[in-house]
Amino acid sequence: MKGILGRKVGMTQLFTNEGILIPVTIVEVKPNVVTKVLTVEKDGYSATQLATEDKKASQIRRPEINKFKQANTTPKRFVKEIRNMTGYSLGDTIDASLFQAGEIVDVTAISKGKGFAGTIKRWNQHIGPKSHGGGGGSQPLRQTGSIGDISGNRVWKGMTMPGHLGSEQVTIQNLEIVKEDPANNMLVIKGSIPGAKGALVVIKKAIKTSHKKEAVQLLNLKEALAKNELFEQAKKYNVELNMQMSIKEMQTLLDEAIKKAEEQKQPEGENK
């Protein structure tokens, strides 16, 4: 098992070399520090405790200072344990290079809070009949239905009732890493993930899927625009180019065609 802590930045879309649009989520992954290593012998289970993002000086408590000193780091804001993550020592640093493009991961975060909601929105219950006497009395339109047997003398725990919707820990499984960018502390994940913008997320290796997909070949927009400009220039000189060529190869063929065109113009000027 392996995992890392990050922060959701937002969603955007990318294009593959085949022109397919992919919705993706950008996750900022600042370097994580190993602040504790838990073992079966000492703690009863194996895990690695990770921490990220420095705390403000005004929020630091004295006990925390000594704890983080042992890991040779400053007090951190977010601390989480990754179960069964082994092979790391106290003070080690983990960055976005932990995951590679094509890997399948599970992402956990606190979902968006949507405030107080009724049973129809919160639990997807049916709306009551809108005609034939419905909408009130014994056939309410949006009211909660039965919440238990009359002989129970109490409401059993777990009944689907109105209440606070959202703000719960949610995990979405089997999401694909589209791109990793350790230089910019960034991971690009295919699809949407839980949480609002700026939410703390935990990215772990998928527990149900062990295989790795072939990395998606993303379109390089700058390169594509440069090639389009070369294609437009090539039309003037009847030069055949294709998208499989590199920019250097295309530029070389175009330069040769321009040079030949100039050489053909020079004798014509001398004859005149």
Swiss-Prot record:
Keywords: Ribonucleoprotein, Ribosomal protein, RNA-binding, rRNA-binding. The keyword Magnesium does not apply. GO terms for molecular function: rRNA binding; structural constituent of ribosome. SUPFAM superfamilies: Translation proteins. Pfam families: Ribosomal_L3. One of its GO terms (cellular component) is cytosolic large ribosomal subunit. One of its GO terms (biological process) is translation. Residues 125-146 are annotated as: Disordered. Part of the 50S ribosomal subunit. Forms a cluster with proteins L14 and L19. Belongs to the universal ribosomal protein uL3 family. PANTHER family: 50S RIBOSOMAL PROTEIN L3, LARGE RIBOSOMAL SUBUNIT PROTEIN UL3C. HAMAP family: Ribosomal_uL3_B. One of the primary rRNA binding proteins, it binds directly near the 3'-end of the 23S rRNA, where it nucleates assembly of the 50S subunit. This is Large ribosomal subunit protein uL3.
